Amino acid sequence: MTDKIAVLLGGTSAEREVSLNSGAAVLAGLREGGIDAYPVDPKEVDVTQLKSMGFQKVFIALHGRGGEDGTLQGMLELMGLPYTGSGVMASALSMDKLRSKLLWQGAGLPVAPWVALTRAEFEKGLSDKQLAEISALGLPVIVKPSREGSSVGMSKVVAENALQDALRLAFQHDEEVLIEKWLSGPEFTVAILGEEILPSIRIQPSGTFYDYEAKYLSDETQYFCPAGLEASQEANLQALVLKAWTTLGCKGWGRIDVMLDSDGQFYLLEANTSPGMTSHSLVPMAARQAGMSFSQLVVRILELAD
């Protein structure tokens, strides 16, 4: 008897719409691969009942809080249900950009200079020391919530008088916010599938940076896979990504986003342990370049579930 698979999609995070699209694609791909899969939306179904509903395994196609941050993973482990992607700790760390950066920095890996602020500090008014630290980053900077995905709540700040508004927006989404030095070079993403690192992708957004619209709505964002790097650069990038992935304790599948600055140095941005799987998504694109169909990709991700 084949396993009955729950594809978790939708949910209640800010990335619900993206997740519904990802989940629909994953569901179709699994069924094409002969898998007995069914959609389950945690917004409508009590996921503590998955086992009593007869499911033996879970494919997590949720993005953001409640699906990608370790909470769901912990519950599935308590229930004894195997699931796709990283475990509790790696999921929680990857969702938290600040703590990812601290870990990577501690491991000697390159990250962009940043200043972290809490909502309480912002509401009280920033100290002279904090203002000096922010000023030392130079302009432009990028302001982002620490625990939000899909570039939700993120802004590029090019003038000092725009910083307060950018912080206000970011604090609508999280208690902690990062102000990061703007890196001017191209952005790359590298997907990981089991032990395999897939070909890197270079991202060229039509706007200022790779924001929510560029990720999911724009037809003008350009993707290059292969990324056009020299063989030695591609090897350096893959080695950096593998180190970043293992430092966080990630497993199964996911991707890591990286910037190449004008100084020729790669800088780690963030890890995604449950990336998008829509028509615009990057992991399927990298898999295609490696000779793998979408259906083969999702079946392989499911095989890696434990």
From Swiss-Prot:
Chain segments annotated as coiled-coil in the UniProt record: none
Domain ATP-grasp: residue ranges: 101-303
Pathway note: Cell wall biogenesis; peptidoglycan biosynthesis
Cofactor: Mg(2+); Mn(2+)
UniProt keyword terms in alphabetical order: ATP-binding, Cell shape, Cell wall biogenesis/degradation, Cytoplasm, Ligase, Magnesium, Manganese, Metal-binding, Nucleotide-binding, Peptidoglycan synthesis
Binding residues annotated for Mg(2+) 1, in chain numbering: 257, 270
Molecular function in Gene Ontology: ATP binding; D-alanine-D-alanine ligase activity; metal ion binding; protein homodimerization activity
Binding residues for ATP: 134-189
Catalysed reactions, semicolon-separated: 2 D-alanine + ATP = D-alanyl-D-alanine + ADP + phosphate + H(+)
Entry-linked Gene3D superfamilies: 3.40.50.20, ATP-grasp fold, A domain (3.30.1490.20), ATP-grasp fold, B domain (3.30.470.20)
Any one Gene Ontology cellular component term annotated for this protein: cytosol
Residues annotated for Mg(2+) 2 binding in this entry: 270, 272
Active site: 15, 150, 281
Free-text comment on the cofactor: Binds 2 magnesium or manganese ions per subunit.
GO biological process assignments: cell wall organization; peptidoglycan biosynthetic process; regulation of cell shape
EC number: 6.3.2.4
Compartmental location: Cytoplasm
EC top class, as a word: ligase
Glycosyltransferase in keyword set: no
Family classification: Belongs to the D-alanine--D-alanine ligase family.
Role summary: Cell wall formation.
Subunit structure: Monomer.
Family annotation (NCBIfam families): D_ala_D_alaTIGR, PRK01372.1
Protein name stated in the entry: D-alanine--D-alanine ligase B
Native source species: Escherichia coli (strain K12)
